[in-house]
């Protein structure tokens, strides 16, 4: 049986979910064998048997190699061809939503990277028929795009066909990028900001992951739900937010076996209709928090050491600049270098 059909069987029968995500080819190779007619047909038959609407309940994940923000035209074209191949595979399978990472600016400015990305998305819309391109938010690491809602606002302004463009919000990435969603008040503030800058109606999927790293760490470190720095409350809020009804909510948490995902699906369903002061939910939240305490302490320690190192480097650099300025003053006289202080 093909891997795609296995994903459906695992999802439907074992972990009792009603949506899923998978790759339509190897996510770490530029080229893969064509999608055979036999595989495509088996997928369609499996979806029909399981009463899955692949156009709405599946959120395919794109290749990790794709970087269409790249300033290098040759590399960008290679990424684009891989991207379009993914989209066409989705259309053959009847899949309606394709999620991908926006990429890194590499040797160009953020504005140039967003322009490159938008141009490729617009071209991809022209070369495909129906699949909706879903851009995922990122943790703000390095030169990656998608770490701020402003990035998405800028990208959206350059997309010609907004009917076929959407956003996937990842809870871990959102938190790591500095958006605090741990309380009802802060969650509302973050979603309101996204709604104002991009539009909540453009969210067509969530990746549900706790975070091993603390707020604003810019680290993409997924943790099992309830064990990390997010805790259960953000997931309760998402599960009870009617704006997300009918869109895929996909787990990307660490799991040695599907049993872990099955438990998390059950936990997420348990949260529906529950208030923050529900006794059973509070007990489960405390239990999971205790289980993850050692890991959180370890990652917080790593984060604090990294931040302290950055502060020392900054102070050293500032000190070097001050020393250089004083030397210039000694050579030229204070009056002649007055502008250096301004």
Curated annotation (Swiss-Prot):
Q: Please list the cofactors this protein needs.
A: Zn(2+)
- Return the cofactor note field: Binds 3 Zn(2+) ions.
Disulfide-bonded cysteines: none
According to the record, the residues making up region (Disordered) are 299-342
Sorted alphabetically, which CDD domains does this protein's record hold? AP2Ec
Instruction: Please name the GO terms of the biological process aspect recorded for this protein, alphabetically.
Output: base-excision repair
* Binding, Zn(2+) 1: 61, 136
Sorted keywords for this record are: DNA damage, DNA repair, Hydrolase, Metal-binding, Nucleus, Zinc
- Biased-composition ranges, Basic and acidic residues, are 299-310
GO molecular function ontology, one term from the record: DNA binding
Main localization, broad class: nucleus
- Matches recorded under SMART domains: AP2Ec (SM00518)
Compartment(s) where it occurs, according to its Swiss-Prot or TrEMBL record: Nucleus
Q: Looking at the keywords, is Transferase present? A: no
Q: Which residues form the signal peptide?
A: none
Q: Where does Zn(2+) 2 bind?
A: 136, 170, 207, 252
CC per GO annotation: cytoplasm; cytosol; mitochondrion; nucleus
Summary of the function given for this chain in its UniProt record: DNA repair enzyme that cleaves apurinic/apyrimidinic (AP) sites and removes 3'-blocking groups present at single strand breaks of damaged DNA. Provides back-up AP endonuclease (APE) activity to apn2 together with uve1.
Protein name, per record: Apurinic-apyrimidinic endonuclease 1
Naturally occurring in which organism (per UniProt): Schizosaccharomyces pombe (strain 972 / ATCC 24843)
Give the taxonomic lineage as stored in the record: Eukaryota, Fungi, Dikarya, Ascomycota, Taphrinomycotina
